[in-house]
Amino acid sequence: MNKSLFSLIFLVSIVFISSGFKHLNGDKKTENPIKWYSIEEAVALQKKKPKKIFIDMYTDWCGWCKRMDATTFTDPTVANYLNENFYCVKFNAEQKTPVVFQGKTFNFVNSGSRGYHELAAALLDGQLGYPSFVYLNEKLERITISPGYKQPSQIMPELKYVGGGHYETLKFNEFISKEQ
């Protein structure tokens, strides 16, 4: 009995100690992850409480998309800024499910080896590269498209540029110059 109790206490102690080391090693994973919505959910929320919409266009096979999920989108600064200033949408650009957006139904198009979703093609102006990010204003009008993998230090300036409404009066390069 004593040996079993000692083993149990030892095992529980190891679990607590190892979980404590995770924080000591500087694990910067956010405790407030990004709240992802479907496009339909984001539009419905936007009607009740207007906010800009951030759309992450991804595919299941995209390695850089997965890397952004594991690094950039788990960064606390990025996650908090996105949650506070945008309704965030994760949109699989090859999903088979029809989507109604602004009164129009968008469908999957079986083309080539994988196909694509018409909404992704429409929002990305036919430039289907992944990851790509689409920013919409409160009227669901596209502000800009931002293609490619981005580290937290690369995406934060563009999030602040769009989220803060600076795109209405400044070009991005002017905004960056003022921020430095």
Regions found by a protein language model. Give the residues of each.
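Bacterial Sec-dependent N-terminal signal peptides
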Residues: M1-D27
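A short beta-strand-turn-helix
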Residues: I34-I53, L82
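Short active-site neighborhood of thiol/selenol oxidoreductases, capturing the structured segment around
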Residues: K49-G63, C88
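Typically the conserved alpha-helix immediately C-terminal to a functionally engaged Cys/Sec
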Residues: K66-N83
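Structural microenvironment flanking redox-active thiols in thiol-disulfide oxidoreductases
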Residues: Y81-F101
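Short, internal strand/loop/helix patches
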Residues: T105-Q127
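A short, hydrophobic beta-strand/beta-hairpin element that forms part of a small beta-sheet core
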Residues: A122, G129-S146
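Thiol-/selenol-based redox modules, centered on thioredoxin-like
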Residues: R142-Q180
